[in-house]
């Protein structure tokens, strides 16, 4: 089977489950090739986050903008380290499902972050262990997160904002994260995890890894 045939087989398998999308994509100036490329990026991003240890089991979610009006979003309740083509859905930028499986319960948060940061092409939500452990250690003093006498910390701490503790998947959480994202590309959600935005998938993941690395250092100093 040629590469072109393999890609066509993947597309047909996805459409057999969720319906044909060629005309739908064309309505937004996209084609099936860009859709498949997006799926590959989403799967790769989740796999890399899983390998980095910032996504475990079924937690976290990722979205990738396709053109100006659409995005791919990880589906609800999937193991991010072992994603398949059918584990991502196609949605409008307002968070409404166009085709595919049920959207992540955190989709509203992604919508809010894209509104806050129009340049973003990817939004990544993870549960990094060191950041979460550090937040427990600093209970009531989250303003001190990553506050260390290091050049690296001085560079990255201003890029981290704090959002309040709201139920996962709630509109209150989405609104809080969206407001915080206006100030910084990384938002720590109290008692929950981290949300990062980037102009690419690599940037969103890189910011996540940077914040987790600094949190690990600070934990050793406490």
What are these regions (language model features)?
Residues 1-222:
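Glycine-rich flexible loops
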